[in-house]
A protein has these predicted regions:
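C-terminal "cap" of GNAT-fold acetyltransferases
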Residues: 42-43, 101, 108-135
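Acetyl-CoA-dependent GNAT
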Residues: 1-50, 55, 68-69, 111, ...
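Hydrophobic adenine-recognition pocket in adenosine-nucleotide-binding enzymes
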Residues: 52-54, 87, 141
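A short, well-structured alpha-helix characteristic of acyl/acetyltransferase catalytic modules
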Residues: 2-7, 125-177
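Conserved acetyl-CoA-binding loop-helix of GNAT-fold acetyltransferases
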Residues: 54, 60-73, 96, 100
């Protein structure tokens, strides 16, 4: 725990100035996850929560779930939308928590003591922000949005070609994933993000923002 804190990864939930939950919130990667690298949805940066513990008197009050949800908020602020976690096969409480948070099972990993653990992953959806027009919101695109983005581009290819010269290089969902990958791999404060405009749950627009080049601040 001392090392967690020194690394800046130790987080707590407090009640009346008393620590009631502790866990590691890390973005440094987990080497054992390479054991199943082909079973994750992508190889972009991810959030991990380890060593989650709740004070005895606060158990069964949703404190662990609140910790996980707050960790998700930390991750969103960093523009990291992958969340991975693992637990022992006999940790029924953690398995129920993971299930309640809609994680997907990805495979089995082994730590140095050769104990098998179940590994899970979920995609965090960026928060949608209203734009002042009823029913319309905007949010950052994630890697998992490649399919709906490609579908929208393919339907409007002729219109897009006039101002998006590289549109004809996007011929498949894989091409769109390849386009999004380096954007989402870039630290949030340095990235040129792609945003999705939505009406209710339907995509109705895309916007690309260029911030990395001080001489070329523009919107597409």
């Amino acid at each position: 725990i001392r090392q967690d804190i020194q690394d800046g990864n130790g987080y707590v939930i407090c009640r009346e100035n008393r620590v009631v939950a502790y866990g590691v919130v890390s973005f440094d990667g987990e080497p054992v996850y390479e054991q199943i690298k082909d079973q994750w949805s992508n190889d972009l940066p991810y959030l991990i929560v380890h060593r989650l513990a709740v004070a005895d008197e606060m158990k069964r009050q949703g404190m662990a779930k609140q910790f996980m949800l707050q960790a998700e908020e930390v991750s969103r602020r960093k523009g990291i939308y992958n969340f991975r976690v693992d637990t022992k096969y006999d940790n029924a409480y953690m398995l129920r928590l993971i299930d309640s948070l809609n994680f997907n099972y990805c495979g089995e990993v082994y730590y140095r003591n050769n104990s098998a653990r179940k590994a899970f992953e979920k995609t965090l959806r960026p928060h949608s922000n209203p734009i002042g027009v009823p029913g319309y919101t905007i949010r950052e695109a994630t890697y998992e949005d490649a399919g709906i983005i490609f579908e929208a581009i393919d339907k409007n290819r002729d219109d897009l070609r006039t101002w998006l010269p590289f549109v004809d290089s996007l011929q498949s969902v894989a091409d769109e994933q390849q386009f999004l990958h380096p954007i989402l791999a870039t630290p949030y404060e340095k990235r040129d993000p792609v945003f999705i405009l939505e009406h209710d749950t339907d995509i109705c627009g895309l916007a690309g923002f260029h911030f990395s080049d001080p001489s070329n601040h523009r919107t597409e």
